[in-house]
């Protein structure tokens, strides 16, 4: 698992109605900036700390051992989706 800073979109701007609570596992879809495709692997995010109302420090990672873990490294920026809806942006710490 990697640590990431997540910037959640406000509900009024198309984000989630409720940001996942601390230690609740969430399964969004991830698109890494610069990649042409959305990664279709089981992906997990667990918020560990709220920095502000719409910012969290979270643990992220792929569930499967054969997933492209090498793509998750410090400095990588990404977008999170729930279905086709963009809900957050983030960067790996």
Predicted regions and their residues:
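C-terminal effector/interaction modules appended to NTPase cores
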Residues: 1-93
